[in-house]
């Protein structure tokens, strides 16, 4: 029997025990007959199931060790809840085996419902939640978005996209260009004020809920650049917006962040430039990750969104002359791949 079927059997036995305890402790009566269905999976090894019965609904996370570790999720869930951010309530946990029984934040993500008409309201709620956790004191034992992490991320682009997807190797001149550009992006990120960073604060990880939004997938949180999450929110892997609207939303966030005491840049143009460069660093990383998911993990579907990230990068290059040589490098690589 495949290993994942064995895990599902183990999870089902564990879930039955936890539901019995949960219903007893809350005086809900006997556990009703329920259904366990696949809720979602993602680009990692984690997968999610939804249990529903007699008006009750829970989500179960299956995060198999050693590939996954539930402990950061649990710790950061409590941290965000302390800031009144709407995150799943953890009803039961088995950290050794990688099982969590969670409250259900609903079935509709922002990505499912967002459109040009409702985006202003949905993003206003997302900004409110972001400001809540950016106000938290930086005293939790979280990693720092330091030089090593930023560099490790950006190097995914030459390793996996250039090397594996395009099948190319940098020339000496291209390598020198890459080193200059990546250093510029890293220096800009490190120069920014620091806050708690979710790292994937995007519509796919925000649920339409009450209160809105429900926030998910925060287990990789770090302390890092103040522009990271807000840039991620508006320059998503799966949906794009006109630049004028993005700048308007960035301006709204910047003004509210200043009023809330978040350490953003004093001038909007400096904030906007930092956001632009932060976005390019993230986009290069994600292009590399999507190539890795394809070639290492056998999940090619994510490569279909790579052109969106190149469009984001090219848009920034058009207004940031300091990144002109990145545009030339990308053009050379794409021409080389076609040759």
UniProtKB/Swiss-Prot annotation:
Its pathway is:
Cell wall biogenesis; peptidoglycan recycling
Keyword Kinase attributed: yes
Q: Which InterPro entries match?
A: Aminoglycoside_PTrfase (IPR002575), Kinase-like_dom_sf (IPR011009)
What GO molecular function terms would the record report? ATP binding; carbohydrate kinase activity
Q: What happens when the gene is disrupted?
A: Cells lacking this gene accumulate GlcNAc and MurNAc. Deletion of this gene increases fosfomycin sensitivity.
For whether the record's keyword set contains Nucleotide-binding, the answer is yes
Keywords, A to Z, come to: Antibiotic resistance, ATP-binding, Carbohydrate metabolism, Cell shape, Cell wall biogenesis/degradation, Kinase, Nucleotide-binding, Peptidoglycan synthesis, Transferase
Catalytic activity entry: N-acetyl-D-muramate + ATP = N-acetyl-alpha-D-muramate 1-phosphate + ADP + H(+); N-acetyl-D-glucosamine + ATP = N-acetyl-alpha-D-glucosamine 1-phosphate + ADP + H(+)
- Enzyme Commission (EC) number: 2.7.1.221
Q: Please provide the Gene Ontology terms (biological process) for this protein.
A: cell wall organization; N-acetylmuramic acid metabolic process; peptidoglycan biosynthetic process; peptidoglycan turnover; regulation of cell shape; response to antibiotic
As for what it does, the entry says: Sugar kinase that catalyzes the ATP-dependent phosphorylation of N-acetylmuramate (MurNAc) and N-acetylglucosamine (GlcNAc) at its C1 hydroxyl group, leading to MurNAc alpha-1P and GlcNAc alpha-1P, respectively. Is involved in peptidoglycan recycling as part of a cell wall recycling pathway that bypasses de novo biosynthesis of the peptidoglycan precursor UDP-MurNAc. Plays a role in intrinsic resistance to fosfomycin, which targets the de novo synthesis of UDP-MurNAc.
Q: Which family does it belong to?
A: Belongs to the kinase AmgK family.
Write the protein's name: N-acetylmuramate/N-acetylglucosamine kinase
Q: Which organism does this record belong to?
A: Pseudomonas putida (strain ATCC 47054 / DSM 6125 / CFBP 8728 / NCIMB 11950 / KT2440)
């Amino acid at each position: 029997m495949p290993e994942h079927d064995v895990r599902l059997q183990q999870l089902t036995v564990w879930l039955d025990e936890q539901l019995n305890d949960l219903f007893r402790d809350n005086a809900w009566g006997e556990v009703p007959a329920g259904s366990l269905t696949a809720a979602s999976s993602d680009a990692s090894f984690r997968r999610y199931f939804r249990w529903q019965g007699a008006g009750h609904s829970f989500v179960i996370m299956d995060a198999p060790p050693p590939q996954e570790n539930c402990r950061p999720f649990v710790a950061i869930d409590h941290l965000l809840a302390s800031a009144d951010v709407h995150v799943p309530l953890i009803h039961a946990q088995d950290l050794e085996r990688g099982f969590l029984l969670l409250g259900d934040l609903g079935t509709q993500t922002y990505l499912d419902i967002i459109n040009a008409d409702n985006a202003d309201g949905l993003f206003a709620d997302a900004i409110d939640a972001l400001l809540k956790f950016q106000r938290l004191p930086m005293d939790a034992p979280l990693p720092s978005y330091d030089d090593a992490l930023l560099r490790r991320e950006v190097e995914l682009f030459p390793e996996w996209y250039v090397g594996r997807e395009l099948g190319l190797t940098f020339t000496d001149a291209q390598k020198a260009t890459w080193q200059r550009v990546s250093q510029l992006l890293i220096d800009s990120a490190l120069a920014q004020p620091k806050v708690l960073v979710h790292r994937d604060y995007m519509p796919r990880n925000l649920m339409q809920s009450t209160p809105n939004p429900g926030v998910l997938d925060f287990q990789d949180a770090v302390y890092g650049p103040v522009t990271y999450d807000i840039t991620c929110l508006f320059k998503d892997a799966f949906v794009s917006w006109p630049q004028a609207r993005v700048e308007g939303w960035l301006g709204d966030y910047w003004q509210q962040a200043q009023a809330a005491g978040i350490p953003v840049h004093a001038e909007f143009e400096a904030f906007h430039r930092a956001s632009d460069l932060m976005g390019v660093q993230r986009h290069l990383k994600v292009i590399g990750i999507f190539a890795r998911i394809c070639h290492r993990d056998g999940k090619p579907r994510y490569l279909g969104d790579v052109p969106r990230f190149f469009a984001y990068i090219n848009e920034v290059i058009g207004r940031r002359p300091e990144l002109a040589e990145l545009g030339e490098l990308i053009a050379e690589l794409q021409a080389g791949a076609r040759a």
